[in-house]
């Protein structure tokens, strides 16, 4: 009788668990976590669960709600390309397709839990499939923009010891040119209708892959994603995030900054290589059960952008300030955005005048937010709060955001200092885990009881934060983080360049752009400066990701330096911004 009872109990648990989810080893009844549970965790009212997997605990739960009619008839992913091609997946379809993708990664590609996978794909549906497949299998997902050059890819593959790369045909030639220098890379997976010698075909393998796959029981703090983030010196650092830091940590962002519900359709303009894609196009959106809309445009243009907003029932728009600066130059009153109700921006400071022009022309407010690759959303203008033009808004839970001095002391309102997040007595779960293989850089982010962002700001008496500038020399242009070292390294490869210093320079559309101060070698000093500028710009575009090239170049006799010979970038930067 006892055996029969135990069998019936086990059968009940098996039938009620989420699809593709293994039972806990102790066969305890599985209780699904809800959006309210995730919010309670972010508000520190509930402990972090021991185990968590975004695919099983979030995506598969929305799939269940679709079956029971608890979620509106709204796609999970809606992709278009402006050429008549369209993809619409429900959460159920996303689940079955991502299980097929998981089998592709683990069987023909031979990847196992904890292996690192580099993914360099444009805004195509396969990017989302591979992302979710990695979550299901415990494979560490490492996204990169398709603008990466062969040199950039080589660094990332060698630094991460990636065992496999998933790439599109735009990137495959660059990978091929450096693959022999990557001894850890075992498999190349091509997402393309074309076949390449030495590459496995994702489409062919996916077509015959099984939909049966059991999701790995991942720990909440288990590594899930690595982002390469630029700094002022050296090459990009590998910021590692866990299943919960991204998968649970963006709950409040989704509910109160993005203001999403399961009936919403969000269009987030971020490139797939950046953490902003994780915020707006994966975790925040799908935590709330919303639809992620994607328009793959060959090249951004305002007319196509505005036509998309008028044609599709997009309710929520998230774009960098650069896009809004371009849009407000159009006569927006001619357009009818019938469904659009909530607009957001972030990645760089937004000019107050642009915010006002957008509001006057569309009747919609712009809600600015501020965050970082390492820690996600830090502060934001949230729905229901007063918007102070030019402010980044108030601090977001679970963070205690403060302004501190060089000794780690909290400064009073109105005093400029570094924007910092309190780490003690308890480190917030949504922090990045570490910079992989770089304990010195990881330790350098801590000052006393705080994590320092590297940004300077001011908090007013109402708790609103105002961005002043970078504490270091990182340039943020059109939302891209650009380290001066990478641009200077590219420039020095050209025979005309003796040395250079790269800083930010004000720009009406992009906020700030890369400017290079260049000391020329003697044989090149008589060259036509305009032609030489174009030559150097073209050289940088070929040597590193094209978005990093210096849009401004000034030839100088010498660079300002300290007594020890270090270039004083701050002098050049101040010179650029002084008259603004």
Curated annotation (Swiss-Prot):
The keyword Electron transport does not apply. It catalyses: a medium-chain fatty acid + ATP + CoA = a medium-chain fatty acyl-CoA + AMP + diphosphate; hexanoate + ATP + CoA = hexanoyl-CoA + AMP + diphosphate; octanoate + ATP + CoA = octanoyl-CoA + AMP + diphosphate; decanoate + ATP + CoA = decanoyl-CoA + AMP + diphosphate. One of its GO terms (biological process) is acyl-CoA metabolic process. It holds the Pfam family AMP-binding. The keyword Protein transport does not apply. Keywords: ATP-binding, Fatty acid metabolism, Ligase, Lipid metabolism, Magnesium, Metal-binding, Mitochondrion, Nucleotide-binding, Transit peptide. One of its GO terms (cellular component) is mitochondrial matrix. Its cofactor is Mg(2+); Mn(2+). Gene3D superfamilies: 3.30.300.30, N-terminal domain of ligase-like. Residues 1-22 form a transit peptide. Its EC number is 6.2.1.2. It comes from the Eukaryota. One of its GO terms (molecular function) is fatty-acyl-CoA synthase activity. Disulfide bonds: none annotated. ATP binds at residues 229-237, 368-373, 455, 470, 566. Belongs to the ATP-dependent AMP-binding enzyme family. Catalyzes the activation of fatty acids by CoA to produce an acyl-CoA, the first step in fatty acid metabolism. Capable of activating medium-chain fatty acids with a preference for C6-12 fatty acids. This is Acyl-coenzyme A synthetase ACSM4, mitochondrial.
């Amino acid at each position: 009788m006892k055996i029969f009872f135990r069998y019936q109990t086990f059968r009940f648990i098996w039938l009620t668990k989420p699809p593709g989810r293994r039972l806990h080893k102790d066969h305890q009844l599985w209780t699904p976590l809800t959006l309210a549970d995730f919010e309670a965790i972010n508000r520190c009212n509930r402990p972090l669960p021991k185990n968590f997997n975004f695919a099983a605990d979030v995506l598969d739960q929305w799939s269940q709600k679709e079956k029971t009619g608890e979620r509106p008839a709204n796609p999970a992913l809606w992709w278009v390309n402006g050429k008549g091609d369209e993809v619409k997946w429900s959460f159920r379809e996303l689940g079955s397709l991502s299980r097929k993708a998981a089998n592709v990664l683990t069987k023909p590609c031979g990847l196992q839990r904890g292996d690192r996978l580099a993914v360099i794909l444009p805004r195509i549906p396969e990017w989302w499939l591979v992302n979710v497949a990695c979550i299901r299998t415990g494979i560490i997902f490492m996204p990169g923009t398709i603008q990466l050059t062969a040199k950039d890819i080589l660094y990332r593959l060698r630094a991460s010891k990636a065992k496999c790369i998933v790439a599109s045909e735009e990137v495959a030639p660059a990978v091929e040119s450096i693959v022999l220098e990557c001894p850890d890379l075992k498999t190349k997976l091509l997402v393309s209708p074309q076949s390449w010698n030495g590459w496995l075909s994702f489409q062919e393998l996916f077509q015959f892959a099984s939909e049966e796959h059991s999701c790995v029981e991942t720990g909440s703090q288990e590594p899930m994603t690595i982002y390469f983030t630029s700094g002022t010196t050296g090459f990009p650092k590998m910021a590692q995030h866990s299943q919960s830091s991204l998968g649970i940590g963006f709950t409040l962002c989704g509910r109160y900054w993005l203001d999403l519900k399961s009936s919403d359709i969000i269009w987030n303009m971020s490139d797939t290589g950046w953490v902003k894609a994780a915020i707006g196009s994966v975790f925040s959106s799908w935590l709330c059960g919303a639809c992620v809309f994607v328009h793959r445009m060959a090249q951004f243009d305002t007319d196509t952008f505005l036509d998309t907003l008028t044609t599709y029932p997009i309710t929520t728009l998230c774009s960098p300030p650069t896009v809004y600066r371009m849009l407000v130059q159009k006569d927006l009153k001619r357009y009818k955005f019938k469904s659009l109700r909530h607009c957001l921006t972030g990645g760089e400071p937004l000019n107050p005048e642009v915010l006002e022009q957008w509001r006057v022309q569309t009747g919609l407010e712009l809600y600015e937010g501020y965050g970082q690759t390492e820690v996600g959303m830090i502060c934001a203008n949230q729905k229901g709060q007063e918007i102070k033009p030019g402010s980044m808004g108030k601090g977001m839970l679970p963070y205690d955001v403060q302004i501190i001095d060089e000794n780690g002391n909290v400064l009073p309102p109105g005093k400029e200092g570094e924007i910092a997040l309190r780490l003690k007595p308890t480190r917030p779960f949504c922090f990045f885990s570490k910079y992989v293989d770089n304990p010195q850089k990881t330790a350098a982010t801590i000052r006393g009881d705080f994590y320092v962002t590297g940004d300077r700001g001011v908090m007013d008496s109402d708790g609103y934060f105002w961005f002043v500038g970078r504490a270091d020399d990182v340039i943020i242009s059109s939302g891209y983080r650009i380290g001066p070292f990478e641009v200077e390294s590219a420039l020095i490869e050209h025979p005309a360049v003796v040395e250079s210093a790269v800083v930010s320079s004000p720009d009406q559309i992009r906020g700030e752009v890369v400017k290079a101060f260049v000391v020329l070698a003697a044989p090149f000093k008589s060259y036509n400066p305009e032609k030489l500028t174009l030559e150097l710009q073209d050289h940088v575009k070929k040597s590193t990701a094209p978005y990093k090239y210096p849009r401004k170049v000034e030839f100088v006799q010498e660079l300002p330096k300290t007594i020890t010979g270090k270039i004083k970038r701050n002098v050049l930067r101040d010179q650029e911004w002084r008259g603004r």
